[in-house]
């Protein structure tokens, strides 16, 4: 894997307002273009990774069901039991679905970023006012809006916006408790019990838990993070520092799920996928990412394990003499305010890698990725396989000092299981179905 620097490369981490000023493409990759808009909205609204994964999944399942129905139902719908709609424009259906979801879920975009709102409107008009007869466009708009409303209704009471009591953890050795500097309660405990998009339950692929604190495996992982993840960085190479920052995807960026959406969109554009395949790819990927979030949060709150900054500072309480306590130790990256085990980055990345490998016919593929971290906007990292990128993304959290190696490995296992399950059980090709001439 090499690193190249491209002078003048547009920074994906620029604020949504700036990104929204880009001209609307003449050649319409409708699903990919709308996913780019969703990423801008995620940046603008500073969504957390679980929140971002939910928004991406709502947009993409709505768009997929709309495109699928308008294209003769070649694939299993996600949440639609009607007939195919032969007279509907698939492109208009996709645009109407995406536009309606974003307009309803994020009504504050227009006031906070008028340029982004204008871009959304321009994309909508591009895809709904030409390229097909007026009746077909109207049918597509109606279909897309209906599918958007159906998905939003399906997820309206999934608990995303509940306000549970503050989760402060425990002072027990090994247990999570607030971390400096904010010392805030744990974020989004409700995500651990959210109804999944595809899984039978949040705990379907629950991992075994952290190793015992008196074990060599636990000590080895703590020592690895203590050495490689320190803010001082004496044992960390410059490339590993770059990797930690490259995949950081902190608040105000596209987030880890969005990073993989961006990677997939680049590959899909290069492969010139048709509209149905674009919609299916993004539906597969976004639901896998959404369920990876739920599965990861299930594990995080089932085991409620302490973060490295706590474990290293209070290592004496572990009873493991193979670890040296250091209360002055600080991580390279800010510690996220929720339990450590498992690594969400590893779960998100492995789920994406599993979906992409199956969709494109194998794990090995040469592709590049960019970062939303502002100081790395001119850096492109190249990979030869999806699994290699997932491995690097997960290891980035160890280099950043906020995860342990066992959490990375178990996060990869959970994410891979989620991605395989989604691909094998949803959005499958089906036999030809009789079409209808009217929108449901």
Question: Where are the model-predicted features located?
Answer:
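Bacterial Sec-dependent signal peptides at the C-terminal "C-region" and cleavage site
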Residues: 21-29
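N-terminal secretory signal peptides that target proteins for export/translocation
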Residues: 1-7
